[in-house]
């Protein structure tokens, strides 16, 4: 299995609406979904081949976007590496009892807590709270990654005259939370080498694009850079157990979790 990194640089305020948005604030996600990346390249392919509404009849189009390639979400890149969603098993000390002697803001992986500690208070991580957001690995340590956002006030105007005047007597106000410009996010396209070679040939190395909400006005300008084809790193196991971290929701279908995970880690070792 091979991969191609996709580097997305935010050039203007960008809003990728969060599904939990409510009220007068439209919140943004802190990452760029793989479906967005696939949509950008699919749109570019349709335009360059002048396919219009008949794209689904094009064999090459279906092979690239509904075949063996998988488009992986882009997460913020840092000097320490590319971040990823913090696993739910990571717990941070909020108000643990003093007798546990946990330092303030200590982060513990609950998956290993019962192996590392010999008292119930420490094993159960009482007074701990889940770590949210994104982290990056630096050797054996992990560090939180802050995605820079800001909020801007907008007003909707009900008539053309009010739009020209720049004011409104009966419009509504709303707020957009957006990703700040000049941040870099890295995702990838994963699949067989032959399919990736076909993918890379179809597009220029650098692309201008617009993503997210209000992308036809002042939001969403980004640049994308397509990297080289490289092997997907294969982890090795030095012990008798494998720790599987899910970056995205897992759909099992009719298979068991044991069979799905077993198949995924089969190449790592016995």
Model-derived features with residue positions:
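Basic, Gly/Ser/Thr-rich N-terminal segments that form RNA-phosphate-binding interfaces in CRISPR RAMP
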Residues: 1-270
């Amino acid at each position: 299995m091979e991969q191609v990194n996709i580097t997305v640089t935010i050039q203007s305020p960008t809003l990728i609406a969060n599904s939990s948005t409510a009220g007068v604030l439209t919140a943004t996600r802190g990452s760029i979904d793989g479906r967005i990346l696939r949509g950008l390249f699919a749109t570019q392919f349709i335009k360059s081949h002048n396919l219009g509404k008949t794209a689904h009849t094009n064999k090459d189009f279906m092979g690239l976007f509904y075949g063996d390639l998988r488009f992986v979400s882009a997460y913020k890149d840092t000097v320490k590496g590319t971040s990823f969603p913090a696993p739910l098993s990571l717990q941070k000390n909020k108000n643990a009892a003093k007798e546990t002697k946990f330092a303030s803001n200590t982060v513990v992986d609950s998956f290993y807590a019962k192996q590392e500690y010999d008292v119930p208070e420490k094993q159960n991580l009482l007074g701990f709270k889940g770590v949210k957001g994104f982290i990056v690995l630096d050797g054996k340590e992990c560090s939180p990654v802050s995605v820079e956002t800001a909020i801007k006030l907008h007003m909707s105007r009900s008539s053309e005259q009010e739009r020209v005047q720049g004011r409104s007597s009966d419009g509504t106000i709303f707020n957009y939370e957006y990703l700040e410009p000049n941040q870099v996010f890295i995702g990838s396209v994963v699949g067989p080498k032959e399919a990736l070679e076909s993918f890379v040939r179809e597009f220029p190395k650098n692309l201008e694009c617009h993503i997210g909400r209000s992308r036809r006005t002042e939001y969403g300008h980004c640049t994308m850079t397509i990297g080289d084809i490289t092997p997907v790193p294969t982890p090795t196991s030095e012990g008798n157990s494998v720790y599987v971290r899910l970056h995205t929701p897992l759909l099992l279908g009719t298979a068991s979790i044991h069979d799905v995970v077993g198949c995924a880690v089969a190449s790592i070792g016995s």
